[in-house]
């Protein structure tokens, strides 16, 4: 079960944070919510559709941090929760990855950029 202020989907719980933070601070705030919580990771197009429905009505056309970065391994990207990248929607490449609320295209930015973010944990 998800806490009342989190949204359930596919055995996971999601929460949109309508405050802008850099990637590391956003990931830390996710972990402060629950120790198993991380910035969101995507593993199917259905999950992506759910995230568009969660984020777009609140943020409008904007971007939010995902857990995808190359901070831990400069050569390849991985989700902050340690899961493998088995679904992707690249628009470009860099260090930390934000997702677009309108079509879920991925955009890479310096990790210091301030963005909204979504946290996720397994229910």
Swiss-Prot record:
Residues 9-120 form the C-type lectin domain. Coiled coil: none annotated. SMART domains: CLECT. Gene3D superfamilies: Mannose-Binding Protein A, subunit A (3.10.100.10). Expressed by the venom gland. It comes from the Eukaryota. GO terms for cellular component: extracellular region. InterPro entries: C-type_lectin-like, C-type_lectin-like/link_sf, C-type_lectin/snaclec_domain, C-type_lectin_CS, CTDL_fold. Disulfide bonds join 2-13, 30-119, 96-111. Keywords: Disulfide bond, Hemostasis impairing toxin, Platelet aggregation inhibiting toxin, Secreted, Toxin. One of its GO terms (molecular function) is toxin activity. It is found in: Secreted. PANTHER family: MANNOSE, PHOSPHOLIPASE, LECTIN RECEPTOR RELATED (PTHR22803). Binds to platelet GPIb (subunit alpha) (GP1BA) and functions as a receptor blocker for vWF binding to GPIb. The platelet GPIb-binding site resides on the GPIB-BP subunit beta and not on the alpha subunit. At a final concentration of 104 nM totally abolishes vWF-dependent shear-induced platelet aggregation (SIPA) at a high shear stress, but had no effect on SIPA at a low shear stress. Heterodimer of subunits alpha and beta; disulfide-linked. Belongs to the snaclec family. This is Snaclec GPIB-binding protein subunit beta. It comes from Bothrops jararaca.
